[in-house]
Amino acid sequence: MTASPDPAQRIDALRRRIEDANYRYHVLDEPQMADADYDKLMRELEALERAHPELASADSPTQRVGHLAASRFAEVRHAMPMLSLGNAFSDEEVTEFVRRISERLEVRQPLFSAEPKLDGLAISLRYENGEFVQGATRGDGATGEDVSANLRTVKAIPLRLRGEGWPRVLEVRGEVYMPRAAFEAYNAQMRAQGGKILANPRNGAAGSLRQLDARITAQRPLSFFAYGVGEVSEGALPQAHSAILAQLRAWGFPVSALVEVVQGSDGLLAYYQRIGEARDGLAFDIDGVVYKLDDLAGQREMGFVSRAPRWAIAHKFPAQEQSTTVEAIEIQIGRTGAATPVARLKPVHVAGVIVTNATLHNADQIARLDVRVGDTVIVRRAGDVIPEVAAVVADQRPPGTQAWQMPTQCPVCGSEIVREEGQAVWRCSGELTCPAQRKEAFRHFVSRRAMDVDGLGEKFIEVLVDSGLVKGVADLYLLSVDQLLQLRLISTADSPHAFLREAREHLASGAYAQLEASVVGIGVDLAGERDVPQTWQADLLRAGLPSFDWNRKKIATKWAENLIEAIEISRDTTLERFLFALGIEHVGESTAKALSAWFGDLELIRHLPWPLFKRVPDIGGEVARSLGHFFDQAGNQKAIDHLLARKVRIGDTHPPSPKLRGELSLANLLEDLEIPKVTPIRAAQIATAFGSIDALRNGGPEPLVEAGVPQSVAESLAAWLLVPANDTLAVNAQRKLSELLAMLPEAGEEKTGPLDGQTVVITGTLAALTRDAAKQRLEALGAKVAGSVSKKTAFLVAGEEAGSKLDKAQSLGVEIWDEARLLAFLGDHGQQP
């Protein structure tokens, strides 16, 4: 009989998988987990956390809505979070939802507002005094993207409210979508013009709102339905959800004609049946229906769980499915070496999209389904969006198929593929010697939220890595314009002959002869077009061509000069960005920000024993160990040294947070070391009795027992300390703990920032630094950087092309700073741009 998995380990595994799925779905726009699997994992995690409240954690996916906003637009902090909804997949779950509300409110047959669940992009529209002032995407629920300019192009969205009686501030929540007929007409037009067609209406809507050029958005046939409200200030709304929707309609917002008020579970299920039967004939895509308690007083009584309201639920439709054939199973290697199996499929049309690939998640999933090359499989776009292999049609399996096995070697670098004990994920052990991991590491390092190297695209990163010019991320800072020009000529040429013809135009004769000799050196017959190896580009790059001074009068150089300038600009960064850019496993933006806020100094962080990281809120054992493992690797420390040697500068270094004083103690250290049987109570008891790690090291269990520690705990601690690695860790951790305490100010000496408690708004374009960088530096000085101007705004920083925010600030008498004043202020307070 197999023992049940340890709840703590299972909870940790579930949190990792769900957070990874959140990141891929919300940030990368590369979903690799089916909605059905995601929902199943989330429900299992919720059940385990209810059963084991002692294992609850603030960084659990159950405590949040999603992940981070995408990075191309300014951030907007939602005044009221845009929460997600719980899901129901069966009649029984809907009935249970109604029962809970009935019992809590003591209402036998509560009324609900029922409405279709549109498959588009959720947004929040902010109106002040009846005028549209800002629009934002949902993002992670707390912070979204400012897409106001794009939303202004959507004709269904009123720029000024009709009628009268609206609140001074009104946030309207709704869905931007693309009607089916408009989607088909748009694609027909694009085909006729040879333009790019859209994959499906949902992607069309989401992609349109993320266009940096609002003129492109204006050409897309977008529409909008309102379904609720967010912040409401200085005004009143009706006390029923259905009445609020009617009021919104009167003020000029489109509201779906399919919204109905129904009673009890029978009414909800009947509505679900009707909408399901009408689904294919609707003018827009939906993936379910939404039920909301109609009475607002009842909504307030029911309240919320951390990530969803208790008074609303989404009843999802079954996913759409088709059968096809598995033509191959391949391995993709990610940034951290994760080896993810992917099914290559015979193309099949599923829910409006041609599917050729589907994730198989991991080796355990393949074994569970017994997926084999040649199998007929059921492909599902769960949630009508994400392709997955749902099942194998076993009776159609051809003879002679073989059960799939995880390769023992990385398909890219040949290193061993290994699986850590207790982990579902297999990983390439090659680390940064693996080109695939190196390329992913570079992509992450230069990304917008990391070092923000503008203009370095994925394809050119591949060329850089394949050429051998960049072996580590620090090598980016050694590149020259001439090297970039040479790489571009090689990578874009159709043949070595074409490359040489182009090169002859831009090189002196002596340099050209040297280049030609290098090409001949890889075995290319230049007498004709025959015998050209297919790998000539990679061979030529690996051969290490000499670098030439190219005639820049005859060759386009602006792109290369801009890229070198972007690399130079990225040298000046923040600790938060630098840590995130390193690509440490499990360390996302929020963790990097917390590390920066609590420790403040890279030199401190990179030499900190891993147990001390657990003193930072929301950093648990897994993340702390991951940090420790990363900084324990000599290669990683060498990479950091190279970056610093190449003039990468962290501009916001500061002393550790005074809040650490309340966290740093021997009792907490003994707990954080994760010694078997040493509970928090026992850790406090041992710390009180012995006072230091040194006092515990060589005495064995007897002194512990004499101090009242139970025999089993004493033996466990003594045995743990006998392991040399554990002993070294404990000693180093206490030494560093003492050093940290000595660095902290005494009580009452804590320094405050010059902008503590002040709200600042940034608008327009800044020349010397990005708005993100300005925001981070202002926050480092204590400011809260908001997305909209109010009477509480301390000052507004106005860059070039400042718009309505500047007008509003002037009308309210808010102090206005230009960029020069901002830069001077930052410089005076140690925040050089």
From Swiss-Prot:
Zn(2+) binds at residues 410, 413, 428, 434. Pfam families: BRCT, DNA_ligase_aden, DNA_ligase_OB, DNA_ligase_ZBD, HHH_2, Nlig-Ia. GO terms for cellular component: cytosol. Its cofactor is Mg(2+); Mn(2+). PROSITE patterns: BRCT, DNA_LIGASE_N1. Residues 750-833 form the BRCT domain. GO terms for biological process: DNA repair; DNA replication. It is an enzyme of class 6 (ligase). It comes from the Bacteria. The active site is at 117 (n6-amp-lysine intermediate). NAD(+) binds at residues 35-39, 84-85, 115, 138, 175, 292, 316. CDD domains: BRCT_DNA_ligase_like, LIGANc. InterPro entries: BRCT_dom (IPR001357), BRCT_dom_sf (IPR036420), DisA/LigA_HHH (IPR041663), DNA_ligase (IPR001679), DNA_ligase_AS (IPR018239), DNAligase_adenylation (IPR013839), DNAligase_N (IPR013840), NA-bd_OB-fold (IPR012340). Keywords: DNA damage, DNA repair, DNA replication, Ligase, Magnesium, Manganese, Metal-binding, NAD, Zinc. It catalyses: NAD(+) + (deoxyribonucleotide)n-3'-hydroxyl + 5'-phospho-(deoxyribonucleotide)m = (deoxyribonucleotide)n+m + AMP + beta-nicotinamide D-nucleotide. Belongs to the NAD-dependent DNA ligase family. LigA subfamily. This is DNA ligase.
